A protein has these predicted regions:
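Amphipathic alpha-helical segments
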Residues: 21-34
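A short, Lys/Arg-rich alpha-helix, primarily the initiator
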Residues: 5-9
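Conserved short beta-strand elements that form part of the metal-binding/catalytic scaffold
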Residues: 34-76, 114-116, 123-125, 129-137
Length: 183
């Protein structure tokens, strides 16, 4: 008997949203997702590939609190979710699209140390962090991977040291950036 469940991949994510129609416009017009199905005006299922859905949106009641006005820093919960794109050119194209649509870019583009993936993070209409990424290290039977422990420094967060960022680096990393410039 196996000692643990062995998932194949992350299947889908469901977000609670304040305006389901605004969110559908965002995810279809900005990220290019396609609508698979609706449950009346209460829930919608969207996809980017062959699975019926990888994102569900659930309409909150009108009297729900605006959690964007409540600090969630240091609280458990979703930090971000991500979609893979073909290559770095698509990340660059995404920057232009986001800027043209006045969508807040939060961080990137950068290149994480762990996973070596290129990333770009922006906000959806409800303030959730959405990441697109490419070029992540693949771990297969033919390409085994030995886990390592990364030092909590600039290289772990962004191997490019914010040189390609189109926004200011996160405050958390400004001190690490100063230290790396002194070395």
């Amino acid at each position: 008997m196996p000692s643990s469940i062995k998932p194949k991949k992350l299947g889908h994510l469901v977000l609670k949203v304040r305006d389901i129609h605004e969110s559908v416009r965002f995810y279809t017009e900005v990220l290019g997702l396609e609508v698979s199905d609706w449950i009346e005006e209460q829930m919608v299922f969207l996809r980017c590939g062959s699975d019926h859905h990888d994102l569900g949106l659930f309409q909150l009641p009108d009297n729900s609190p605006d959690l964007n006005n409540i600090s969630s820093e240091g609280s458990p919960g979703l930090e971000h979710f991500s979609y893979e794109v073909e290559d770095y050119r698509e990340v660059e194209r995404a920057i232009s699209i986001l800027q043209e649509k006045n969508i807040e870019i939060v961080r990137g583009p950068g290149k994480h140390g762990p996973g070596e993936n290129v990333f770009l993070v922006f906000r959806d209409p409800d303030g959730n962090f959405v990441e697109i990424y490419c070029e992540m290290v693949q771990v297969t039977e033919d390409q085994p991977y030995e886990p390592s422990v990364w030092e909590d420094n600039l290289d772990a967060f962004d191997q490019w040291h914010f040189k390609k960022f189109v926004v200011d680096p996160p405050a958390l990393y400004e001190e690490k950036l100063k230290k790396s410039e002194l070395s």
